[in-house]
Structures are given as C-alpha cells and as structure tokens.
Amino acid sequence: MKNRELFSEKNRKNYKMKYFIISFSLFIVLLAICSVVLFMYSLDFDISNLIGSTTTTTATPADEEITNNYSVNELNGKSDLLFIIEDIDGIDFVCVVSTNFDNKSMIVKCVDGSENLSYKNRTLKIDSVYLEDNVVGVKKALADNFNFLVDKYIILDKESLKNVLSLFDGFSVNVLKDVNHKSYDFNLTLTKGKQELSPDMTYRYLQISDNNTRESIICDIIKSVLVAPYAEKSENLFTSFVNSCETDISVIDYAESAERLYIYCYANDKFYPETYNKGDNS
C-alpha cells in the first residue's frame, strides 16, 4: 500500500483536476491504469517508496481503514475522451467516454463508421468525415451532433484494440441476447446473461455488435478494470498501452493524475458508466 502521505490535503489541492479527468477516462474505455511511475523513471527518481512489490499481500486493518476513507466527492470537473477504432478503409467505430464529476455521471457513446452525421451543412458518414478532416473533423461532428467537447483522443486499429484488451485477465459482461455468429474470420457463441468473458471473446463480441450493444460492453469493461488490483499494476499497463496507440495524452498528463485515479479505484462510493440513451451528457 502506498504511503499515506501521498494523500495529504496539500497534494490533493495542488494537482490539476483537468488532467485527472482525461486520464481517468482513458483507463475507462480500454484500459490501462496509469501511474506516475514512468514519469519518475524518466527523471531518475527513487520510486521505492511510491510503489511496492508486485507480490500479493494481505491488507491490514489499518490499510482497510485508509482505503475506506477515499471518496469521489473530493473530485470535480468534466471531460470527454475520444477513442477512434480504425479498420483498413477508415473508421470501424468511435467511442466517447464523457465523465462529469460534478453530477457524478459517466456516459459511453458509440458511433459506427457508417453512421450519417451532420457536418459542415452536409450529411456524411463519420468515416468520410475522418478521411476528409482527420481527428479534427470527427471532434467537430461529435460536438455538433451530440454536444461532446472532446479534450483528448486515442486511435487504435483492430489489432491494437485486441492487444489492449489482452492486458487484462477478463471482463464481467452482460450479454444482452444469445449470440451464434459464424463467419470466415471467427465464430462466437454466447448465452444471454452476465458472465466472464476472455479478452478474445470480448473483442469478438465488440466486433459483431451494434452501437447500443457496444456501449453496454464498454460500460462493463470499465467496471472490470477500474478496480484496486489493476491500480497496483499501472507501470506495465501504461507502457503496453502507449506502445499500442496514437494519442495526444502525454506522460506528464498521466503523472499529474495518478493520485486521484488511485483514490477513485479504492473509493467505496464510486459511480459507474451508463450507455448514452440511459445517461445525460449535459
């Protein structure tokens, strides 16, 4: 367990909330619990007191008391993070994770690459918007059509998405209806209901799903990864993630957000994501 000194009131007031929300959202859709570790490495700091052994230990009563004091009520602000999942021809789908700590909400919105949106007084598929104006165009289309104000973006191709999911042990996913998919690429059979899915099965389920189902899957992924055990593995997760994607989120962004992300993972009063139709992105 990290030193209790890390969570002093002085430190909590000094960090920039904006960077926390961006990092927090990142670990939400996929997925790596970031840490200050790499940033410290780059400065040759001694981090022995910041991160302990990877060996599993049993929490003491004192540790449990500290953990139970963490609360998301200390956090505030709002940010929208964009994920673009590419295929050979352009966009497979995009996902926005909109986090608002002021009203304790987290909204997941997916848009298929073939979906038509209003863009510059025209109706275009979001894939066409991406080919025409790249990330800037996609951000404008999402703002005009859904009122999302994207702060940062992450771009993954399908293979990179699969690699990111494989960083985790698996996910507790609510399968919305029976699945019996057979194609040249892969077969997938699932029974309706909540169940544990491997990273590979989760990836396949995402690939064959519509927007509403994708949103539900991603919400379940978020719930599975924003937990204390993954907060303790942040160094390897961070390294693997940034090696798999294109993003405008810097190592410093992660470093300045690590403490609050850690607090959220241990908080007993955390809120959870909802699909776009159920939530409110205002």
Residue ranges, per PLM feature:
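Non-catalytic, solvent-exposed segments at the cell envelope interface
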Residues: 2-20, 24-282
